[in-house]
Each structure stands twice: as C-alpha cells, then as structure tokens.
C-alpha cells in the first residue's frame, strides 16, 4: 500500500456492509440446512430468540453480533432505497 493516499473510514457504510455480509451468511446457512431463511430470520427478529437461527457455519454466533433494531433499520433502508 502506498503512503500517498489517505483512506477514510466510514462507520455508517461499514455497519451497512457488515450487516449485509452477516445476513447473507446466515441466510445461506439456513438454506443449506433446509430451513426457510426468511421465516427463521423474521422469527428471530420478532422474538429475540437466537434458536430460530441454526448453529451451522456459526450462523447463530454471527447474527447475535448485530443488534436486532440495527438489522431492521438496515432492512427498511434497503427496502425503501434510502442510503
């Protein structure tokens, strides 16, 4: 890496990217185990019960790293096309 350029850290974009990466991994893990990923994620988001999420591929450990309200915030922003 060259010392000529300063890289800016954007915590908002970083959170958005991290949330998307984690949800994608969790979704794929649920799908691989034969679950309906959308139903399982909705169950988790509504109840807060992490047992809706499989332990397969560490999916449960990943999803609990995120606050449920922050997940919902990112999902709503994405749905409405708001950055």
Swiss-Prot record:
Tell me where on the tree of life, at the top rank, the source sits.
Answer: Bacteria
Xref: InterPro entries: IreB (IPR009309)
**One Pfam family here:** IreB
NCBIfam families per the UniProt record, alphabetical? PRK05473.1
Q: Which family does it belong to?
A: Belongs to the UPF0297 family.
Please identify the protein, giving its name as recorded. Answer: UPF0297 protein CBO2563/CLC_2434
Q: Species lineage, top-down?
A: Bacteria, Bacillati, Bacillota, Clostridia, Eubacteriales
